[in-house]
Every structure is written in structure tokens, then in C-alpha cells.
Amino acid sequence: MQDFSEPGSGKADGEGSAVPSPAVVAQQAVQELVLPQPVIRMNPDEKHAQLVRVPTWMWLDRGMWQPVSRTVSVPGVSVTATAIPRAAAWAMGDGKTVVCAGPGTPYAVKYAADSASPDCGHTYLRSSARQSGEAYTVLVSVTWDVEWHGGGQQGAVPGLVTRAQVPLRVAEAQALVVS
């Protein structure tokens, strides 16, 4: 149990019951936030081999790219913490990192097969054949900004992070020109 008898804890001198400060209640609200895990989507699909020098599209399910809030109320104080996804950093497994400001654009057949994603993509220059399992490990880290307000106060909590990863095989294909 939290000891609110410390200075600045929200307990007034001589009071018989502790009233936590809004910042303390905010910590609890942040701890109780349930952030969705990223669901990685790619084109070509991560179940199939990607080709060297062909653009890879990456995106996250749009349903997870939404604000998440949690309100915690204790006698005398109610605080709401809201987490908003800010960026997705994709470690592509080949030493490159791609930072996307949003969830990315889902690939659709209306796009040319060799077109690059308008906002979240990567082009591999080497095969993954020499990697463990002959695949790169693609790791996405979504950073969430958290703001809270309540009890006449407000504040921010530095980025929370959720992560997901998938293996991605990248193959080389060679064309044979026959005349």
C-alpha cells in the first residue's frame, strides 16, 4: 500500500485519511492502460519470400492505431490517462531501421507490384539466406505518448512501447534472357 504521509503526497497535515496526489493516481492509471499489441502486415505477406530489390510494404492493423484511455478514481481524485500511438520503428533485420509516423498504408492490388509504399516501406538489397533460419527478424516497436489529467493537474509520461516481430525470408531471383 502506498504511504501518503510523505510531503507532497496529497495528505493535508492533521488529516485522518490519505488523499493521494493526482500524480500518484496518474501512475496507477498509466500502469492499468491496456495497449494493443501490434499486428504486423506486409506485402509480400510474411508467409512468403520477399525478393531482393522489390519494395516491401509494411503496415499495422489500423484498429490498434487508436488512442487508449484509462480512468482511475479514488476518494477525492479522478485521473484519466490517454495513450496515443506516435510512431512505429521497424528494425528490418538487415541493419536498417525505418521509422513511420503512422500505421502505414495497406497494400492493395490497385498499386503496381513494384511500387514503393507511400509512407512505410523498405527495399532489401541482400538475401536472408545466410541468416539464422534463412530469414531476417523484423521487429516493430510502437511508441505511445501518454498524457494525463485530473484533480486540477495534468502531465505527460515518456513513451510507452509495444513490440511484435516476425521472420521474413528474402530471396534472390535471377532472370534468364532467351533470344
Briefly describe each language-model feature range.
Residues 1-179:
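Extracellular/lumenal mature domains of secreted and surface-exposed proteins
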